[in-house]
Curated annotation (Swiss-Prot):
Name of the coding gene: dxs
GO BP terms, alphabetized: 1-deoxy-D-xylulose 5-phosphate biosynthetic process; isopentenyl diphosphate biosynthetic process, methylerythritol 4-phosphate pathway; terpenoid biosynthetic process; thiamine biosynthetic process
Taxonomic source organism: Albidiferax ferrireducens (strain ATCC BAA-621 / DSM 15236 / T118) (Rhodoferax ferrireducens)
Cross-referenced Pfam families: DXP_synthase_N, Transket_pyr, Transketolase_C
Enzyme class: transferase
Gene Ontology molecular functions: 1-deoxy-D-xylulose-5-phosphate synthase activity; magnesium ion binding; thiamine pyrophosphate binding
Pathway: Metabolic intermediate biosynthesis; 1-deoxy-D-xylulose 5-phosphate biosynthesis; 1-deoxy-D-xylulose 5-phosphate from D-glyceraldehyde 3-phosphate and pyruvate: step 1/1
Its biological purpose: Catalyzes the acyloin condensation reaction between C atoms 2 and 3 of pyruvate and glyceraldehyde 3-phosphate to yield 1-deoxy-D-xylulose-5-phosphate (DXP).
Protein name: 1-deoxy-D-xylulose-5-phosphate synthase
Subunit structure: Homodimer.
Cofactors, names only: Mg(2+); thiamine diphosphate
Catalyzed chemical reaction(s): D-glyceraldehyde 3-phosphate + pyruvate + H(+) = 1-deoxy-D-xylulose 5-phosphate + CO2
Classification of source organism: Bacteria, Pseudomonadati, Pseudomonadota, Betaproteobacteria, Burkholderiales
Length: 632
C-alpha cells in the first residue's frame, strides 16, 4: 500500500514511534490505521469486525503504557491486528494467516510485544495476574493488562481469575471491551468526567482513607458504602467488580481517545487491581460491518467498496451444513432432542434449528464446562441432548465429560466440528486431540464418518444409543457425496471393506478414506472404512489382519494415542503380530496455512500416503498379488 495513503501510519514501526506522535494527531493516526486494516484484511481474509472495534483502544494502550516493558494480554486474540500493525508487523500483514506468514492471533515467538499466546477465550486475566505477581515478587515496576470482551467474561475461568486477582495486591489492569453493549452503554459527558475522576489518585486515596476511618464505626461505614454504590448506580453498572476487590472505572467510549488516554494515564499511577470498562462497536468505521458485524466477523477476500457478495452456490454441502440439517430433521420426529452450543450458533450450523425449535435451543455462552454438565442434567431427565462444539473447545470441558457424563453413562451426543486440521486458525484451533482424549474414557464411543452422507447416518446411529457418543467431522466440504434425506442409522461399531487389493491393507478413519482409495488404485492395496475408533470393529480388523501381510492406519488426528494406537492395542490383545504403519498428525503443533498444503506437509495427502507405504512395504507391493480372502 502506498506510503502517501497513510503518511502518519508509515512513520510508526514500533510503539516508541507512536509515543512521539503529538496527541492532537492521534485521531488522524487511528483513522489511517482503521483504513489500512480494512484494506489489508480485504486482501487476505481474516477477522474484521472485532479489529475495527479495537483501533482506538490499541492506540491508547501503546501510547500510554511502556510496552513491551508493561505487559498486555489480549483475550481470544483475534482483535489484535491493530496491535500487530503498530508493533513492527505492518508490512507482513499481506501474509496474514498464510503458511509461513503472520498468525491471526498473538504468538510469543512472533514478536516481543505478544506477551502471551491466546486464541481460546477467557484466559487473559489469569495470565496477566501471573505476570503482575511475578513483577511484584521480582521487585519490578510494571503494569500487566488484560483486555477481555464481554462475551469472554461469561466463562467461569474469567471470574475465577477476578476472584483471585482482587486480593492479590498487584498492579493489574483489566479492561472490559464491551462490544455488544450487553452490560451497559456509556452515558455521555458526565460519564466521561466521572471516569476521569474515578481513575484519579485523589479519588482513590480519599476512598481508601474514608473507608479506613469509617471501619471504626460499622453502621456509618455500611451507610457510606451503600451511598457510594447508589451514586455510581446512576451512571455506571452495579459494583460487581468492586466486590471482587477492583477499583471500577467507567464505562467510557472506547472510540474516544480524549477519554481513553487521560483515564489510562491516571490508572497508570494507581496501585492495586483496576478495572476499566470501555464500550466499543464491532465494525466501527466501516458501515457495512457496523450494520452486520456477524457477517464481517471472519470474511474471506472482498472489495471494501462493494462489501461481501453472496457466495456462489457450491455443489458440495459442508459437514456443518449436514449436521445442521440432520439436527432439524431429527428434532422434527423426536421431541426429546435438545441442542446446545457454547456461543457457536453460526459456526456449528444451528441457526435454522434455533429458528424452528427455539424452546429446545440453548446457547450457553462461552462456557464449555457448563455446556457439558448442563447436557448431563438434561439427559438425566429423559431428554436427548446434542452438544454442537468444535473439537478444540471440548478440551475445555474434559473433566465434566468424564465426571458428569461418562461416569453416569448418560446419552449425550457430541457433534465435534472442526476435527483435524483447520487451516488459517492454526495450532490453537486444530481438532487434533479428540480421538486420544475420548477413546480412553469408559462408556464413550467415537465415530469418524468418511463423507457427508455417512456423517448424517452416524449422527443417527449416535442419537439412537443410550450412552455418550462423539461424532467427529472436519471443517468445510467433503468428497461431495450426495446426502440422503432419511434418518437411517448405520450399524453401531461396524466398518466395511471398500476395496480389496494386495497383501497390504489401509485402515482409514474418517475422510482420509478418499486419498486412501486414490492410493489403492495405484498400489492395488485393500482399503477399509473403519468408521468407528471406539468401539473398534475388532472382528473386521482381525479378518483383515489374517488376510494381509501388513496394515496401514490413516487418520487426521494426533498419531500418539490415536486410532492407529487403538489398532495396535487390539492386535496385541488378540496375540496377532503384524507390521503396522501408522499415519496421522505428527507429535508437533501445526501452524496456520492452507489445509491442503498442511495435510501434504504431514504426508496425509494421496501422494504422501503412497510414498510412506511404498517406502515401508515395497517388497509386499507385487503387481497382481492379491489377498484372496479379502477378494472373496
Amino acid at each position: 500500500m502506498p506510503h502517501n495513503s497513510y503518511p502518519l501510519l508509515h512513520t510508526i514501526n514500533d510503539p516508541a514511534d507512536l509515543r512521539l506522535v503529538p496527541r492532537a494527531q492521534l485521531g488522524a493516526l487511528a483513522d489511517e490505521l482503521r483504513a489500512y486494516l480494512l484494506h489489508s484484511v480485504a486482501k487476505t481474509g481474516g477477522h474484521l469486525s472485532s479489529n475495527l472495534g479495537t483501533v482506538e483502544l490499541t492506540v491508547a494502550l501503546h501510547y500510554v503504557f511502556n510496552t513491551p516493558h508493561d505487559r498486555v494480554v489480549w483475550d481470544v486474540g483475534h482483535q489484535t491486528y491493530p496491535h500487530k500493525i503498530l508493533t513492527g508487523r505492518r508490512e507482513r500483514m499481506a501474509t496474514l494467516r498464510q503458511l509461513g506468514g503472520l498468525s491471526g492471533f498473538p504468538q510469543r515467538g512472533e514478536s516481543e510485544y505478544d506477551d502471551f499466546g491466546t486464541a481460546h477465550s477467557s484466559t487473559s486475566i489469569s495470565a496477566a495476574l501471573g505476570m503482575a505477581l511475578a513483577a511484584k515478587i521480582r521487585g519490578e515496576e510494571r503494569y500487566a493488562i488484560a483486555v477481555i470482551g464481554d462475551g469472554a467474561l461469561t466463562a467461569g475461568m474469567a471470574f475465577e481469575a477476578l476472584n483471585n486477582a482482587g486480593v492479590a495486591d498487584c498492579n493489574l489492569l483489566v479492561i472490559l471491551n464491551d462490544n455488544d453493549m450487553s452490560i451497559s452503554p456509556p452515558v455521555g459527558a458526565l460519564n466521561r468526567h466521572l471516569a476521569k475522576l474515578m481513575s484519579g489518585q485523589f479519588y482513590a486515596a480519599a476512598k481508601n482513607v474514608g473507608k479506613t476511618v469509617l471501619k471504626g464505626a460499622p453502621p456509618l461505614f455500611e451507610l457510606a458504602k451503600r451511598l457510594e454504590e447508589s451514586a455510581k448506580g446512576m451512571v455506571v453498572p452495579a459494583t460487581l467488580f468492586e466486590k471482587f476487590g477492583f477499583n471500577y472505572i467507567g464505562p467510557i467510549d472506547g472510540h474516544d481517545l480524549d477519554a481513553l488516554i487521560p483515564t489510562l494515564e491516571n490508572i497508570k499511577h494507581l496501585k492495586g487491581p483496576q478495572f476499566l470498562h470501555v464500550v466499543t462497536k464491532k465494525g466501527q468505521g466501516y458501515k457495512l460491518a457496523e450494520a452486520d458485524p456477524v457477517a464481517y466477523h471472519g470474511p474471506g477476500k472482498f472489495d471494501p467498496a462493494v462489501g461481501l457478495q453472496a457466495p456462489a452456490t457450491s455443489p458440495k454441502q459442508t459437514f456443518t451444513q449436514v449436521f445442521g440439517q440432520w439436527l432439524c430433521d431429527m428434532a422434527a420426529v423426536d421431541p426429546r432432542l435438545v441442542g446446545i452450543t457454547p456461543a457457536m450458533r453460526e459456526g456449528s450450523g444451528m441457526v435454522e434449528f434455533e429458528q424452528r425449535f427455539p424452546q429446545r435451543f440453548f446457547d450457553v455462552g462461552i462456557a464449555e464446562q457448563h455446556a457439558v454438565t448442563f447436557a448431563a442434567g438434561l439427559a438425566c431427565e429423559g431428554l436427548k441432548p446434542v452438544v454442537a462444539i468444535y473439537s478444540t473447545f471440548l478440551q475445555r470441558g474434559y473433566d465434566q465429560l468424564i465426571h458428569d457424563v461418562a461416569i453416569q453413562n448418560l446419552p449425550v451426543v457430541f457433534a465435534l466440528d472442526r476435527a483435524g486440521l483447520v487451516g488459517a486458525d492454526g495450532a490453537t484451533h486444530a481438532g487434533a486431540y479428540d480421538i486420544p482424549f475420548l477413546r480412553c474414557i469408559p462408556n464413550v464411543s467415537v465415530a469418524c464418518p468418511a463423507d457427508e452422507n455417512e456423517c448424517r447416518q452416524l449422527l443417527s446411529t449416535a442419537f439412537a444409543q443410550n450412552h455418550p457418543v462423539a461424532v467427529r467431522y472436519p471443517r468445510g466440504a467433503g468428497a461431495g457425496t450426495v446426502v440422503q434425506a432419511g434418518l437411517e442409522a448405520l450399524p453401531f461399531g461396524q466398518g466395511e471393506i471398500r476395496r480389496a487389493g494386495s497383501s497390504v491393507a489401509i485402515l482409514a478413519f474418517g475422510t482420509l478414506l478418499h486419498p486412501a482409495l486414490q492410493v489403492a488404485e495405484k498400489l492395488n492395496v485393500t482399503v477399509v472404512n473403519m468408521r468407528w475408533v471406539k468401539p473398534l470393529d475388532v472382528a473386521l480388523l482381525l479378518q483383515v489382519a489374517a488376510d494381509h501381510d501388513a496394515l496401514v492406519t490413516v487418520e487426521e488426528g494426533a498419531i500418539m494415542g490415536g486410532a492407529g494406537s487403538a489398532v495396535l492395542e487390539a492386535l496385541q490383545a488378540a496375540g496377532v503380530l503384524k507390521p503396522v504403519l501408522q499415519l496421522g498428525l505428527r507429535d508437533e503443533f501445526i501452524e496456520h496455512g492452507d489445509p491442503a498444503k498442511l495435510l501434504a506437509l504431514q504426508g496425509l495427502d494421496a501422494a504422501g500416503i503412497q510414498a510412506s507405504i511404498t517406502k515401508r512395504f515395497a517388497a509386499l507391493l507385487v503387481p497382481g498379488r492379491l489377498a484372496l480372502k479379502a477378494v472373496a
